[in-house]
From Swiss-Prot:
Protein name: Light-harvesting protein B-800/850 gamma chain
Role noted for this protein: Seems to be required for the LH-II stabilization.
Upper lineage: Bacteria, Pseudomonadati, Pseudomonadota, Alphaproteobacteria, Rhodobacterales
Gene Ontology CC terms, in alphabetical order: light-harvesting complex
Keyword set, alphabetical order: Antenna complex, Light-harvesting polypeptide
Gene transcribed to yield this protein: pucE
Organism: Rhodobacter capsulatus
Length: 118
């Protein structure tokens, strides 16, 4: 120990003042503090039969039931039939949207050509 340390001051928080001629030894022997306790520490590991999450979430996190099969069989009706009652596909041939023949009233009235050839 050096001489510039106040060894015998009344406000020092040591049970026994450190003496200059004291030989250095174990910390607990020197200051009289018990550093190792015989009582076991409280364990940090969560003990018990429940999962820790069950303390704040009451429903099970993992289900034991088998999952439902979500694949649609090939012979099942289309899913759209559940909410749309009209048939989505028709067996009749499709009607043409083109005006048949040479009936073009707009083009004939204003004299506009319907097809421009370059």
């Amino acid at each position: 120990m050096t001489d510039n340390i106040m060894k015998d001051h009344r406000h020092i928080f040591l049970p026994q003042p450190v003496k200059a001629d004291e030989k250095p030894g174990a910390f607990s022997e020197r200051f009289g503090w018990k550093l190792l306790l015989d009582t076991p520490r409280k364990k940090n590991v969560y003990e018990g039969t429940k999962f820790m999450s069950q303390d704040f979430w009451p429903t099970p996190l993992v289900k034991t039931t088998a999952p439902k099969v979500k694949l649609i069989p090939a012979d099942a009706p289309p899913q759209s039939a559940k909410f749309w009652k009209a048939p989505l596909l028709k067996d009749t041939p499709r009607q043409s949207n083109v005006i048949p023949g040479d009936f073009l009233p707009f083009s004939n009235t204003f004299g506009l050509a319907t097809i421009q050839r370059r």
